[in-house]
């Protein structure tokens, strides 16, 4: 991937427009988790430290275009950002009619981009209006990189200079390191409730990895493909043949899809359900598999400890219930102990990492969500493609 980076730009005396992802959750009218705001600070501070004025734009929630309601207002986000920066951050509601006059060190925020007509349809005129505000456009919203919208793609086409922010560049560099030029052996963990939601990821990674670990309901479908009885466990019978193809593809290249030989089962899916460890051959018709067993966890942990690269998306058991958390904990700790470069993404994965206290030991934790998954699928991310295109158009590569 060839794109300009903010940290390569001379921004002194310039106005920088940063598309951030500050779509934070609220509880009781207050921001309940400011992780996304803090993740964007590096780019804002870089600009301020280097003599620029900054305009931040972000989406918040899912407002209807052309309508504005109190819950759509980014004012609380601007106030929180201002608190972190130690300066006032004003919200601009009429920025199209009144272009702001800014001095070096100023920070302002545009009102919620998703109330603007044409935002979701990637309207070029709206993109030009955004671009007219700045000398340099910075996309630092990796979480929206898989969407072609006016504040992520059209603006990049129209801006004098378009580059990746600190967070965006970090995400892309880490993903590139993990998937484009991985240290071997490369091991991926893909887990979740359904094969159907991760089928393209499984197929894409099967072309790249040396070992493909599956977990959760996905593993149950693969167990069915191996002819194993899984009781009343969640599985997709219509995707057994697809699972067989993926296993055959891995075997043909000398790899494998290592499936559990022992599992943790219960009669019901509940926080107080009794957990029983069983050999996979002994799962009864009225039981459901809710985690991998200790023998399987130990074997998979050995694979991870010996890996050169690990890509992790999804817990291998119902880790929210402690009695079914052993498998995910064992794998998380193995990744933490491994010398491999590791990258992890997805909401449940990040929650598991936090629960088991291995955040500092993971090589890179992606904030991307849907963008992370689409990158794993091998899809082009529109916002990233726009940055690459503008670099080529400007004759910079």
Swiss-Prot record:
Name the positions where ATP binds: 198, 320, 346-349
For molecular function, the Gene Ontology terms on record are: ADP binding; ATP binding; phosphoglycerate kinase activity
Question: What does the record give as the reaction this protein catalyses?
Answer: (2R)-3-phosphoglycerate + ATP = (2R)-3-phospho-glyceroyl phosphate + ADP
Q: Give, as in the UniProt entry, the pathway in which the protein acts.
A: Carbohydrate degradation; glycolysis; pyruvate from D-glyceraldehyde 3-phosphate: step 2/5
Q: Name one Pfam family in it.
A: PGK
> What is the E.C. number?
2.7.2.3
> According to its UniProt record, where is this protein located?
Cytoplasm
Q: What's a single GO CC term here?
A: cytosol
Kindly list the biological process annotations in GO that this record carries: gluconeogenesis; glycolytic process
Instruction: Detail which positions bind substrate.
Output: 21-23, 36, 59-62, 114, 147
What's the main place this protein lives? Answer: cytoplasm
Q: Name the InterPro entries for this protein.
A: Phosphoglycerate_kinase (IPR001576), Phosphoglycerate_kinase_CS (IPR015911), Phosphoglycerate_kinase_N (IPR015824), Phosphoglycerate_kinase_sf (IPR036043)
Keywords, comma-separated and alphabetical: ATP-binding, Cytoplasm, Glycolysis, Kinase, Nucleotide-binding, Transferase
Which EC main class describes this enzyme? Answer: transferase
Under the subunit heading, UniProt states: Monomer.
Q: What HAMAP family has UniProt attached to this entry?
A: Phosphoglyc_kinase
Identify its protein family: Belongs to the phosphoglycerate kinase family.
This protein is called what?
Answer: Phosphoglycerate kinase
Q: Which organism is it from?
A: Neisseria gonorrhoeae (strain ATCC 700825 / FA 1090)
């Amino acid at each position: 991937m060839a794109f300009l980076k903010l940290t390569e730009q001379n921004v002194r005396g310039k106005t920088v427009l940063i598309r951030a992802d500050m779509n934070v959750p609220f509880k009781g009218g207050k921001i309940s988790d400011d992780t996304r705001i803090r993740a964007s600070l590096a780019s804002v501070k870089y600009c301020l430290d280097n003599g620029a004025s900054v305009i931040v734009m972000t989406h918040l929630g899912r407002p209807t275009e052309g309508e504005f309601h109190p819950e759509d207002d980014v004012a609380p986000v601007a106030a929180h950002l201002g608190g972190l920066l130690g300066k006032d951050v004003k919200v601009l509601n009429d920025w199209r009619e009144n272009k702001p006059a800014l001095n070096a060190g100023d920070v302002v925020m545009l009102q919620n981009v998703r109330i603007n007509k044409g935002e979701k349809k990637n309207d070029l005129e709206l993109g030009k209006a955004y671009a007219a505000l700045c000398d340099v456009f910075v996309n630092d919203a990796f979480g929206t990189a898989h969407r072609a919208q006016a504040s992520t793609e059209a603006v990049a086409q129209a801006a004098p200079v378009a580059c990746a922010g600190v967070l965006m560049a970090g995400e892309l560099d880490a993903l590139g390191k993990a998937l484009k030029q991985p240290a071997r052996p490369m091991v991926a963990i893909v887990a979740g409730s359904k094969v159907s939601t991760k089928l393209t990821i499984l197929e894409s990674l099967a072309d790249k990895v040396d070992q493909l670990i599956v977990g959760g309901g996905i593993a149950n479908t693969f167990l069915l493909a191996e002819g194993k009885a899984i009781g009343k466990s969640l599985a997709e019978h219509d995707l057994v043949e697809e699972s067989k193809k993926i296993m055959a593809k891995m075997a043909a290249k000398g790899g494998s899809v290592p499936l559990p030989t022992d599992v943790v089962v219960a009669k019901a899916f509940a926080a107080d359900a009794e957990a029983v460890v069983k050999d996979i051959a002994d799962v009864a018709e009225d039981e459901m598999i809710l985690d991998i067993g200790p023998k399987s966890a130990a074997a998979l942990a050995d694979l991870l400890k010996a890996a050169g690269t690990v890509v992790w998306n999804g817990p291998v058991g119902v880790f929210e219930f402690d009695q079914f958390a052993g498998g995910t904990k064992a794998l998380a700790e193995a990744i933490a102990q491994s010398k491999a470069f590791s990258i992890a993404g997805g909401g449940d994965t990040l929650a598991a990492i936090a629960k088991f206290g291995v955040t500092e030991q993971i090589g890179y934790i992606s904030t991307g969500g849907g963008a992370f998954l689409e990158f794993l699928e091998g899809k082009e991310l529109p916002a990233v493609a726009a940055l690459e295109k503008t670099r080529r158009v400007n004759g910079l590569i």
